Amino acid sequence: LTGLLIMADWIASNTYYFPLIKTDCLGKDTDYPKRVNNAIERLNFPEFWIPGENDWGMDDALFEERFGFLPREVQHTAMEIAQNTIEPGIFILEAQMGVGKTEAALAMAEILGQKAGSGGIFFGLPTQATANGLFPRLMKWAEQQSENVKLGIRLAHGAVALNEDYQQLIKGSALSVGEDEENNLVVHSWFEGRKVALLVDFVIGTIDQLLMAALNQRHVMLRHLGLAGKVVIIDEVHSYDSYMMTFLERILNWLGAYHV
């Protein structure tokens, strides 16, 4: 709730969305619905992600449609566990390289997101290089989630200006979200600030974006607001040092409290 109030305050305080008015206009109730509607039109936020096409979760055909190959044993097992899960919790997937852990994680995210009513995912990786490397694959998966609507995506780390894929996506998002452009994934300018990065539906970035939610800092509840409705995927967790693990343990407690 605190994060939502901060977000609402920032929007309401922006004179582009709510232009200043004369003092003699204050108190006229008939003016406010029009001002709010104008602000909503100017904000033009993307739609919300609604995961899952099938009531039964994900079968082999849908998996192949998502990723271009039939599920292997590790993906079958992961999907079966996710489909039999009732309450949100922590899932640990450990396997050798090349077996498709990323695809298994995204398939589980889609299934668990449908069960929990989640509105997005956060995919945390140890370095900018690994986040950049995975970004095209996440885009391909996310594009299939947004065939009929415009959904927001964000690459979150300190050097996104050097990522060509992301910069091309920003250029393609310069048109209005409501217009009929080909790309269904958009980078919305309002969510480009570092404090609001996690509010987008699909976020892939360095793990520090998640760990900062465990710090005592201003506007930290905006990060909590973004995480509370997501499926959170943490990759290469074995590579984190004891210092990072201290913050990870704290944020996992928060995520558990939010039933993430």
Q: Where are each of the predicted segments found?
A:
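Conserved pre-motif I regulatory segment
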Residues: 57-94
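Inter-Walker segment of RecA-like/P-loop motor cores
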Residues: 145-213
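Walker A/P-loop NTP-binding motif
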Residues: 102-119, 137, 251-254
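Pre-Walker A (Motif I) flank of P-loop NTPase domains
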Residues: 86-92, 118-120, 199-200, 260
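N-terminal accessory nucleic-acid engagement/regulatory domains that precede
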Residues: 1-65
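Conserved Walker A/P-loop ATP-binding site and its immediately adjacent core
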Residues: 119-143, 155-161
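SF2 helicase catalytic motif II
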Residues: 220-258
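Walker A/P-loop
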Residues: 87-109, 240-241
